């Protein structure tokens, strides 16, 4: 019994020493830069509701543009190119389409973008009267149509 207690005590002491030694080593390492690019990682959502906080999210995608396009966005490369053209100003992607015929039904749809664009925090939303006005306002652009 005494031998067992001594063996368990010695094993616990050895484990503590190993953990202390590796923890000290991990803290001493300097963080390495992963990229020379400013981060451009976004979460884009479309939801039913008057504002982003209360909208029931129907679709959501991720979009990463630097160093190369990626994420779950179905057209990541085209979306990144479109955002680069407007310098990440999402409001410039929304316009009025004069040839669209939409009902006056009030069933609000909110599009939101949260994340970082070229290293700057982004928190943008736009609310449309219904799905038809959203599609008309977003047009054929790739960034906000997913």
UniProtKB/Swiss-Prot annotation:
Subunit annotation: Homodimer.
Protein's recorded name: Subtilisin inhibitor
> In the record, which residues are listed under signal peptide?
1-28
Q: Which UniProt keywords apply?
A: Disulfide bond, Protease inhibitor, Secreted, Serine protease inhibitor, Signal
Q: Does the keyword Disulfide bond apply?
A: yes
Q: Where in the cell is it found?
A: Secreted
- Which organism does this record belong to? Streptomyces violaceus (Streptomyces venezuelae)
Q: Among its keywords, does the record have Secreted?
A: yes
